[in-house]
Amino acid sequence: DEVQHAPALLTYVKERIDGERDRRGLWVLTGSQNLLLAKGVTETLAGRVALLRLLPLSLREMTGDPDRPLPWEAGGARLAAPPPASPAASWPWLVRGCYPQLVAEPDLDPHLWHQSYLGTYLERDVRDLTQIGDLLQFQLFVRALAARSAQLLNLSGLARELGIAVNTAKRWLSLLEATYQVVVLRPYHASLGKRLVKTPKVYFTDTGTLCHLVGLRDPDHAAAGPMAGARLETAVVAELLKAALHRGEQPDLYFWRTATGVEVDALVRTYDERGERLVPLEVKTTATASARMAAGIARLGGDLGERVAPGYVVYLGDRRLPLGQNVTALPLAEL
C-alpha cells in the first residue's frame, strides 16, 4: 500500500515480474497518488502492469451490484426492485460521501472523517507531490473550487478573487486532478459552425468531500437552495466516471452548452455500427418528471441529428417514465 512512498521497490518488483512472466496477478500495488507523478519514481513498470484508477465507491458497489450495465448498455434492463430513490433517501449518502470506511461504518461521523481526511491530504499527499507555498491559500482555493463544482470554470476570475496568479491556480487545479479530488469535464464540439461554449466544467469526485468543504452537514440543507442541482449533478457525473474507471476503461464523458445557455449536463460517447453515438443525460432534483425537463436534449438532437442516442433525465423519483420521443426519466438509483 502507498507504494509511491517507496519508489526504490519498483525496480525489484520489475525484476521479479520479469523472472515470472508466465505468472500474472502476483503483485497488487496501491497508492493514493498518481504513481507516474510521484517524486522519485523512475520505474513505471511499463508493459508489466494494468493500471486501475479507483474513485470512492459507486452506487452499484454500495448496493452489491457492481457489474450491472448502465441503462443504455447491452443488458442494461431496468431493475426489478431498484433501491429507494426518493429525495429523503438520496441526500444522506450524497452528504456523507462514498469512501469505503464511511460506507462500511455507518456510525462514523462524516464531518470528522472528512476533516481528518482533508488534513492528511493537505499535509501528506499534496506536499509529497509539490511545493505548495502558502498552504492556507491553497485551502481557500480548494473551498472556492468546491463552491463551483458542476459550473463553468473561470480560473482567471477565481485567481483574481483569491489574489493569486492564474498560473498558480492552473498548477493547483492540476494537482487536485493528479490526486483524484476533482475532474475537469470538457465541452463536446462538433464541426457545425455553431456558437458553443468552450469553457470546461469542474467536478469533485466525492460529494461528501464537496459538502464538507462548503460547510454542509445536514441532508435537508444540501437538498435546498440554488446549488442543490449542482451537488446532484456532481454526484451523477461522479457515478458516470466510476462506471468506466472501475472496470478499467477511460471515461468518454462531456457536456454540451450553447452560447445562449442551452445545456445538456452530460454526454456519454459510445460507438456502434453506425459510428459515434452520444447518450445525453440531464440531472434534475425533483421527484416528479415532466417533458419540459428534456428541452436541452431535444435541442441537442436537433443540432446533431442521428448522432444523438436516446437520452435520460436523471431525477429523484422511483420509476422510469417516457418523456417524449427518445427520452426517459431515469431514477437516480438505476444509474
Say what each PLM segment does.
Residues 1-2:
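Walker B catalytic acidic pair
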Residues 10-29, 42-43:
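Conserved catalytic/switch belt of AAA+ P-loop NTPases
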Residues 32-37, 56-61, 189, 209, ...:
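Conserved nucleotide-binding/hydrolysis micro-motifs of P-loop NTPases
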Residues 34, 38-147, 151-152:
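Interdomain motor-coupling "hinge/lid" segment immediately C-terminal to the ATP-binding subdomain
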Residues 103-278:
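Accessory nucleic acid-recognition modules appended to NTPase machines
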Residues 245-246, 273, 299-307:
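Arginine/glycine-rich "motif VI" loop of SF2 helicases in the C-terminal RecA-like domain
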Residues 283-291:
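Short beta-strand-loop-alpha-helix junction that forms the active-site gateway
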Residues 314-335:
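Domain-level recognition of nuclease-like catalytic cores that cleave nucleotide substrates
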